[in-house]
């Protein structure tokens, strides 16, 4: 019987094509894209390319694509975006 995994909220399988595309950046071409040195410049170029490719595949503008470090950061960004667009008078929101 094949493996059945139902907890995709916690972890998801990685498509082989994604793994192959990412391998150079996981093994040898890594760097901080905010840094000024050559490693950072290489990483910055890779992030810009990924942003353009992602935008093109979604029919969006590159400047509208935001990469986050994880689910919590992404959720907070979505909540803040909604609030800024729909609740201009301020107030408080509590999330867990």
Which residues make up each language-model segment?
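Pyridoxal 5′-phosphate
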Residues: 1-96
